[in-house]
A protein has these predicted regions:
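Glycine-rich phosphate/ribose-binding loops and adjacent secondary-structure elements
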Residues: 1-110
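Terminal amphipathic helices with adjacent charged low-complexity linkers/tails
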Residues: 8, 139-198
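Short alpha-helical interface elements
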Residues: 30, 61, 65, 76, ...
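Active-site or pore-adjacent capping/gating segments
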Residues: 74, 82-149, 153-154
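Conserved small-residue-rich
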Residues: 201
Length: 201
């Protein structure tokens, strides 16, 4: 049984990936996340698992949209590395990172000027932006928007004729079968009476 399901978008990942994989492999996290959410709700399993998403999440808007599609946890890597000084040279696996972010070379590591305070500031402002979006929507807690695709409104102004042909119905479909749309209960593993659990530690 899974406690956590991670949906990773193609936009994220390591700079050590081959260029062909970065350009041509994978899909956006929205597609996988919405399909996972819909399938779990249809089968009455959504309440038992947490959904996590990552893949170039950078702003509060990204977080709020992913939450509306069903995510409860959010992964950040590229944005955090950039805050610490990463210049996206794609040398992570060669031990030659010119700014000392991804290297064990002592000379290159001396070029690293990132500080923990930069990350604290970044995530503080990110959380503040999320809070502002929640206030604008009119909800008090993040839990109130998880899986609520009905809150996503498509902006139709300034659309080109081709853009107006794109439909988001399958991504924004909401399953209303009375099942939970976010994590509500812990998994039941049926191991309450095994000796390892009963023995004092």
């Amino acid at each position: 049984k899974a406690d956590l399901i991670v949906s990773s978008g193609a936009e994220g990942g390591t700079g050590a990936s081959p260029a062909s994989s970065i350009r041509y492999a994978g899909i956006s996290p929205e597609l996988g996340l919405s399909e996972t959410q819909q399938t779990l709700v249809l089968n009455g399993l959504r309440g038992q698992v947490m959904l996590q998403v990552d893949g170039q999440l950078k702003t509060g808007r990204d977080i709020v949209l992913m939450a509306m599609l069903g995510a409860e946890e959010f992964g950040f890597a590229t944005s955090a590395l950039i805050v610490l000084g990463c210049v996206m040279m794609r040398k992570c696996h060669q031990n030659t990172c010119p700014v000392g972010v991804a290297t064990q070379n002592e000379e290159l590591r001396r070029r690293f000027h990132g500080r923990s305070e930069y990350l604290v500031n970044f995530f503080t402002f990110l959380a503040q932006e999320v809070r502002e979006y929640l206030a604008e929507i009119g909800v008090e807690r993040m839990d109130d928007i998880i899986g609520r695709t009905d809150l996503i409104i498509r902006k139709s102004e300034n659309e080109s004729p081709k853009q107006s042909l794109i439909t988001f119905d399958k991504i924004l479909a909401r399953v209303d079968n009375g099942a939970a749309i976010r994590h509500t209960i812990d998994q039941q593993y049926g191991i309450d009476h095994v000796k390892d659990v009963e023995m004092p530690h």
